[in-house]
Amino acid sequence: MRMKRFLTIVQILLVVIIIIFGYKIVQTYIEDKQERANYEKLQQKFQMLMSKHQEHVRPQFESLEKINKDIVGWIKLSGTSLNYPVLQGKTNHDYLNLDFEREHRRKGSIFMDFRNELKNLNHNTILYGHHVGDNTMFDVLEDYLKQSFYEKHKIIEFDNKYGKYQLQVFSAYKTTTKDNYIRTDFENDQDYQQFLDETKRKSVINSDVNVTVKDRIMTLSTCEDAYSETTKRIVVVAKIIKVS
């Protein structure tokens, strides 16, 4: 009798667990679907603005700033899902779990380090984004660890209110948060050169992009593991070339 009661309780608990787990899966699916729809609308809006103002970047971002004043840029990699606004908060925690409409989302936003200057670029501009495992946000950074992918995607597009840029990728590697790869400025040219040399040395891809202390670079950073918290990181670094 006791065993029968025990088994009944276990069955009830299992049903409850399945219901809760199923609810969370459905909830996540609905939220992700809504988030994709929101980004698609913004992508279409940005594309329309770009076609109208190809020579002048400022008007596009005036429109985006009306949506959220923290939208400071746009990053795109043709042929992939990387096509997002770049946010910048007062800290590096502001947009970890907020989208461009400041709604709480598990994927957060692509965001720029709060220390970076927008008009007068630092030596190293840093962008962060989640690795979420569904080919969105900064998932594409993992692909850069393969030479074959790099060969087909050497240039990333970046826009901000002050100009249009090409990001010429020259390094991709795995590291941890103990590695101080997120320095934004350097004491002198020698210090910066050492950083550039180390960035090239760590790379798992071969690149012929020439980078000197006169250049500015952009570092894209994401977690190595898409499904659990980790101190491991995937890093892609590019030389910044102003186009207009």
Curated annotation (Swiss-Prot):
Residues 1-6 are cytoplasmic. It is a single-pass type II membrane protein. The record marks R233 as: Transition state stabilizer. Coiled coil: none annotated. CDD domains: Sortase_B. Residues 25-244 are extracellular. Disruption phenotype: Loss of cell wall anchoring of IsdC. No effect on establishment of mouse infections, however reduced bacterial persistence after 9 days infection in mice (using strain Newman, which is more pathogenic than RN4220). Its EC number is 3.4.22.71. It catalyses: The enzyme catalyzes a cell wall sorting reaction in which a surface protein with a sorting signal containing a NPXTN motif is cleaved between the Thr and Asn residue. The resulting threonine carboxyl end of the protein is covalently attached to a pentaglycine cross-bridge of peptidoglycan. One of its GO terms (molecular function) is hydrolase activity. It is found in: Cell membrane. Its main location: membrane. Inhibited by MTSET (2-(Trimethylammonium)-ethyl-methanethiosulfonate) and E64 ([n- (l-3-trans-carboxyoxirane-2-carbonyl)-l-leucyl]-amido(4-guanido)butane). Inhibited by coptisine. It is an enzyme of class 3 (hydrolase). Transpeptidase that anchors surface proteins to the cell wall. Recognizes and modifies its substrate by proteolytic cleavage of a C-terminal sorting signal. Following cleavage, a covalent intermediate is formed via a thioester bond between the sortase and its substrate, which is then transferred and covalently attached to the cell wall. This sortase recognizes an Asn-Pro-Gln-Thr-Asn (NPQTN) motif in IsdC, which is cleaved by the sortase between the threonine and aspargine residues; may only have 1 substrate in this bacterium. This is Sortase B. The gene is srtB.
